[in-house]
Amino acid sequence: MILVDTSVWIDHFHHSDPVLVSLLHEDEIGSHPLVAEELAMGSLRARDDVLRHLAHLRQFPVLSHDELLTLVAAHALWGRGLSPVDAHLLGSV
């Protein structure tokens, strides 16, 4: 199962990625609520369709606040330029 980051989806929406399309057809792509939320905040063509399709993909788990802070401490993730969303995605895979 592959978690696709927001930037990869945005690139795909601008120029279809045949590898991503193939992986989607093979049911190898999953999503995360924070990726859907980031995309929902942007300017998407066919916004409702995109969000609906993302919701139908298998979902990666969401970390609690304490789980995220434990992950950051355990792997010394501070000061590396990661956003909280990046850390959540790392912790969900």
Predicted regions located by residue number:
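Active-site neighborhoods of divalent-metal-dependent phosphate/nucleic-acid chemistry enzymes
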Residues: 12, 18, 59-93
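Short, well-structured N-terminal submotif of metal-dependent ribonuclease cores
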Residues: 1-36, 40-52, 58
